[in-house]
Amino acid sequence: MGIGEESTKPIWGSVSHTSSGYALNGKIMLSSVIVLFVAVIMILCFHSYARWLFRRHNRRIRRRIRSHLRTLSASPRDQALDQAVLDKIPIFVYSSKNPPPPEEKEECSVCLSEFEEEDEGRLLPKCGHSFHVDCIDTWFRSRSTCPLCRAPVQPPFQVIETGSSSSSSPLTFPTEGCEREPIDLAGIIVDISREVEFEGSNPGLPIENGSKFPGSRVLSLKRLWSI
Protein backbone atom coordinates (compact mmCIF):
# COMPACT_ATOMS: atom_id res chain seq x y z
CA MET A 1 0.00 0.00 0.00
CA GLY A 2 2.73 2.42 0.75
CA ILE A 3 4.46 1.74 -2.53
CA GLY A 4 1.22 2.42 -4.56
CA GLU A 5 0.57 5.65 -2.77
CA GLU A 6 4.07 6.87 -3.50
CA SER A 7 3.70 6.04 -7.22
CA THR A 8 0.45 8.02 -7.56
CA LYS A 9 1.72 11.24 -6.01
CA PRO A 10 3.71 12.56 -9.04
CA ILE A 11 0.77 11.85 -11.38
CA TRP A 12 -1.61 14.02 -9.36
CA GLY A 13 1.04 16.71 -9.15
CA SER A 14 1.49 16.88 -12.90
CA VAL A 15 -2.28 17.09 -13.47
CA SER A 16 -2.62 19.98 -11.07
CA HIS A 17 0.30 21.76 -12.74
CA THR A 18 -1.20 21.46 -16.22
CA SER A 19 -4.63 22.65 -15.03
CA SER A 20 -3.11 25.75 -13.49
CA GLY A 21 -1.26 26.42 -16.78
CA TYR A 22 -4.49 26.19 -18.78
CA ALA A 23 -6.18 28.60 -16.39
CA LEU A 24 -3.32 31.08 -16.79
CA ASN A 25 -3.45 30.84 -20.57
CA GLY A 26 -7.22 31.38 -20.51
CA LYS A 27 -6.84 34.49 -18.41
CA ILE A 28 -4.20 35.85 -20.79
CA MET A 29 -6.42 35.22 -23.82
CA LEU A 30 -9.40 36.84 -22.15
CA SER A 31 -7.43 39.91 -21.14
CA SER A 32 -5.95 40.27 -24.64
CA VAL A 33 -9.40 40.04 -26.22
CA ILE A 34 -10.70 42.69 -23.83
CA VAL A 35 -7.76 44.98 -24.57
CA LEU A 36 -8.22 44.51 -28.33
CA PHE A 37 -11.94 45.22 -28.08
CA VAL A 38 -11.32 48.40 -26.09
CA ALA A 39 -8.68 49.51 -28.61
CA VAL A 40 -11.07 48.99 -31.54
CA ILE A 41 -13.77 50.99 -29.76
CA MET A 42 -11.33 53.82 -29.06
CA ILE A 43 -10.20 53.88 -32.70
CA LEU A 44 -13.80 54.03 -33.92
CA CYS A 45 -14.61 56.83 -31.48
CA PHE A 46 -11.54 58.79 -32.56
CA HIS A 47 -12.41 58.30 -36.25
CA SER A 48 -15.98 59.46 -35.78
CA TYR A 49 -14.82 62.48 -33.76
CA ALA A 50 -12.27 63.45 -36.41
CA ARG A 51 -14.90 63.10 -39.13
CA TRP A 52 -17.30 65.28 -37.14
CA LEU A 53 -14.62 67.95 -36.76
CA PHE A 54 -13.89 67.80 -40.48
CA ARG A 55 -17.56 68.25 -41.39
CA ARG A 56 -17.90 71.08 -38.90
CA HIS A 57 -14.90 72.84 -40.43
CA ASN A 58 -16.35 72.44 -43.93
CA ARG A 59 -19.71 73.80 -42.80
CA ARG A 60 -18.03 76.88 -41.35
CA ILE A 61 -16.18 77.47 -44.60
CA ARG A 62 -19.41 77.10 -46.58
CA ARG A 63 -21.21 79.57 -44.32
CA ARG A 64 -18.45 82.14 -44.71
CA ILE A 65 -18.43 81.76 -48.47
CA ARG A 66 -22.22 82.00 -48.65
CA SER A 67 -22.23 85.17 -46.57
CA HIS A 68 -19.52 86.63 -48.77
CA LEU A 69 -21.42 85.72 -51.94
CA ARG A 70 -24.59 87.25 -50.54
CA THR A 71 -22.79 90.52 -49.98
CA LEU A 72 -21.53 90.36 -53.55
CA SER A 73 -25.01 89.64 -54.86
CA ALA A 74 -26.29 92.81 -53.19
CA SER A 75 -24.23 95.00 -55.53
CA PRO A 76 -26.23 96.14 -58.63
CA ARG A 77 -23.24 95.87 -61.00
CA ASP A 78 -23.21 92.08 -60.94
CA GLN A 79 -25.44 90.12 -63.28
CA ALA A 80 -27.13 87.07 -61.77
CA LEU A 81 -28.01 83.93 -63.65
CA ASP A 82 -31.57 83.53 -64.79
CA GLN A 83 -33.59 81.20 -62.58
CA ALA A 84 -34.96 79.35 -65.60
CA VAL A 85 -31.41 78.57 -66.75
CA LEU A 86 -30.40 77.54 -63.23
CA ASP A 87 -33.29 75.07 -62.99
CA LYS A 88 -32.14 73.36 -66.18
CA ILE A 89 -28.68 72.52 -64.77
CA PRO A 90 -28.74 68.82 -63.76
CA ILE A 91 -28.39 67.74 -60.11
CA PHE A 92 -26.55 64.56 -59.10
CA VAL A 93 -26.05 62.66 -55.82
CA TYR A 94 -22.42 61.83 -55.08
CA SER A 95 -21.52 58.21 -54.27
CA SER A 96 -18.12 56.60 -53.75
CA LYS A 97 -19.32 53.59 -55.75
CA ASN A 98 -19.65 55.73 -58.87
CA PRO A 99 -16.83 58.28 -58.63
CA PRO A 100 -16.24 60.89 -61.35
CA PRO A 101 -13.55 60.41 -64.01
CA PRO A 102 -9.94 60.79 -62.83
CA GLU A 103 -9.43 64.05 -64.75
CA GLU A 104 -12.20 65.70 -62.73
CA LYS A 105 -11.74 66.78 -59.13
CA GLU A 106 -13.84 65.27 -56.34
CA GLU A 107 -14.10 68.57 -54.49
CA CYS A 108 -16.17 71.72 -54.72
CA SER A 109 -14.12 74.68 -55.90
CA VAL A 110 -16.38 77.14 -54.10
CA CYS A 111 -16.09 75.78 -50.54
CA LEU A 112 -12.83 73.83 -51.19
CA SER A 113 -14.20 70.66 -49.56
CA GLU A 114 -14.51 67.16 -50.98
CA PHE A 115 -17.80 65.53 -51.87
CA GLU A 116 -19.13 63.15 -49.25
CA GLU A 117 -21.68 60.38 -49.44
CA GLU A 118 -25.14 61.48 -50.60
CA ASP A 119 -24.04 65.08 -51.21
CA GLU A 120 -26.08 66.85 -53.89
CA GLY A 121 -24.20 68.73 -56.58
CA ARG A 122 -24.71 70.45 -59.91
CA LEU A 123 -22.78 69.56 -63.06
CA LEU A 124 -22.28 72.51 -65.41
CA PRO A 125 -23.09 71.46 -68.98
CA LYS A 126 -20.42 73.41 -70.89
CA CYS A 127 -17.24 73.00 -68.82
CA GLY A 128 -18.23 69.85 -66.87
CA HIS A 129 -17.22 71.19 -63.44
CA SER A 130 -19.24 70.03 -60.43
CA PHE A 131 -20.12 71.95 -57.26
CA HIS A 132 -22.37 71.61 -54.23
CA VAL A 133 -25.94 72.70 -54.88
CA ASP A 134 -25.98 75.26 -52.07
CA CYS A 135 -22.59 76.68 -53.03
CA ILE A 136 -23.22 77.06 -56.75
CA ASP A 137 -26.78 78.38 -56.27
CA THR A 138 -25.41 81.07 -53.97
CA TRP A 139 -22.70 81.85 -56.51
CA PHE A 140 -25.18 82.21 -59.38
CA ARG A 141 -27.15 84.79 -57.42
CA SER A 142 -24.41 87.27 -58.27
CA ARG A 143 -22.58 85.67 -61.20
CA SER A 144 -23.45 83.92 -64.46
CA THR A 145 -20.10 82.18 -65.13
CA CYS A 146 -18.32 79.10 -63.81
CA PRO A 147 -16.35 79.83 -60.59
CA LEU A 148 -13.42 77.72 -61.80
CA CYS A 149 -12.93 78.51 -65.51
CA ARG A 150 -15.20 81.59 -65.88
CA ALA A 151 -17.03 79.98 -68.80
CA PRO A 152 -20.52 81.43 -69.41
CA VAL A 153 -23.35 79.12 -68.40
CA GLN A 154 -26.09 80.61 -70.56
CA PRO A 155 -25.63 81.05 -74.35
CA PRO A 156 -24.70 84.56 -75.52
CA PHE A 157 -27.14 86.74 -77.37
CA GLN A 158 -26.97 86.69 -81.19
CA VAL A 159 -25.62 89.97 -82.52
CA ILE A 160 -26.49 90.88 -86.10
CA GLU A 161 -23.66 92.60 -87.94
CA THR A 162 -24.58 95.91 -89.49
CA GLY A 163 -22.17 95.52 -92.41
CA SER A 164 -23.78 92.38 -93.78
CA SER A 165 -27.30 93.71 -93.43
CA SER A 166 -26.47 97.00 -95.12
CA SER A 167 -24.85 95.29 -98.10
CA SER A 168 -27.71 92.88 -98.71
CA SER A 169 -30.66 95.23 -98.28
CA PRO A 170 -30.81 98.88 -99.39
CA LEU A 171 -31.35 101.66 -96.93
CA THR A 172 -34.90 102.95 -96.70
CA PHE A 173 -35.90 106.19 -95.04
CA PRO A 174 -39.37 106.85 -93.66
CA THR A 175 -41.48 109.40 -95.50
CA GLU A 176 -43.98 109.98 -92.74
CA GLY A 177 -41.96 112.81 -91.24
CA CYS A 178 -41.72 114.77 -94.52
CA GLU A 179 -43.89 117.87 -94.58
CA ARG A 180 -43.88 118.34 -98.37
CA GLU A 181 -45.38 115.91 -100.81
CA PRO A 182 -43.66 115.09 -104.14
CA ILE A 183 -44.91 117.13 -107.10
CA ASP A 184 -46.44 115.19 -109.95
CA LEU A 185 -45.16 116.68 -113.26
CA ALA A 186 -47.06 114.33 -115.55
CA GLY A 187 -50.14 116.54 -115.86
CA ILE A 188 -48.32 119.82 -116.66
CA ILE A 189 -48.36 120.86 -120.36
CA VAL A 190 -46.66 123.99 -121.61
CA ASP A 191 -48.70 125.65 -124.35
CA ILE A 192 -46.44 127.80 -126.57
CA SER A 193 -48.82 128.23 -129.54
CA ARG A 194 -50.79 130.96 -127.86
CA GLU A 195 -47.61 132.79 -127.06
CA VAL A 196 -46.57 132.68 -130.73
CA GLU A 197 -49.93 133.94 -131.98
CA PHE A 198 -49.93 136.65 -129.39
CA GLU A 199 -46.48 137.81 -130.33
CA GLY A 200 -47.22 137.69 -134.09
CA SER A 201 -50.45 139.68 -133.86
CA ASN A 202 -48.87 142.43 -131.78
CA PRO A 203 -45.35 142.98 -133.03
CA GLY A 204 -45.13 146.39 -131.47
CA LEU A 205 -45.33 145.20 -127.92
CA PRO A 206 -42.31 145.93 -125.86
CA ILE A 207 -40.05 143.21 -124.73
CA GLU A 208 -40.96 143.85 -121.11
CA ASN A 209 -44.53 142.65 -121.67
CA GLY A 210 -43.35 139.65 -123.64
CA SER A 211 -40.82 138.74 -121.00
CA LYS A 212 -43.63 137.91 -118.64
CA PHE A 213 -44.32 134.73 -120.61
CA PRO A 214 -41.78 131.93 -120.83
CA GLY A 215 -42.61 131.32 -124.53
CA SER A 216 -41.53 134.80 -125.57
CA ARG A 217 -38.13 134.26 -124.01
CA VAL A 218 -37.60 131.11 -126.06
CA LEU A 219 -38.59 132.87 -129.32
CA SER A 220 -36.33 135.83 -128.63
CA LEU A 221 -33.39 133.52 -128.12
CA LYS A 222 -34.17 131.77 -131.45
CA ARG A 223 -34.17 135.12 -133.26
CA LEU A 224 -30.80 136.04 -131.81
CA TRP A 225 -29.35 132.72 -132.98
CA SER A 226 -30.76 133.19 -136.51
CA ILE A 227 -29.10 136.60 -136.80
UniProtKB/Swiss-Prot annotation:
The chain crosses the membrane at residues 28-48. It comes from the Eukaryota. Pfam families: zf-RING_2. Keywords: Membrane, Metal-binding, Transferase, Transmembrane, Transmembrane helix, Ubl conjugation pathway, Zinc, Zinc-finger. GO terms for cellular component: membrane. It is an enzyme of class 2 (transferase). It is found in: Membrane. It catalyses: S-ubiquitinyl-[E2 ubiquitin-conjugating enzyme]-L-cysteine + [acceptor protein]-L-lysine = [E2 ubiquitin-conjugating enzyme]-L-cysteine + N(6)-ubiquitinyl-[acceptor protein]-L-lysine. GO terms for molecular function: transferase activity; zinc ion binding. CDD domains: RING-H2_EL5-like (cd16461). A zinc finger (RING-type) spans 108-150. It is a single-pass membrane protein. Pathway: Protein modification; protein ubiquitination. One of its GO terms (biological process) is protein ubiquitination. Its EC number is 2.3.2.27. The RING-type zinc finger domain mediates binding to an E2 ubiquitin-conjugating enzyme. Belongs to the RING-type zinc finger family. ATL subfamily. This is RING-H2 finger protein ATL64. It comes from Arabidopsis thaliana. The lineage of its organism: Eukaryota, Viridiplantae, Streptophyta, Embryophyta, Tracheophyta. The gene is ATL64.
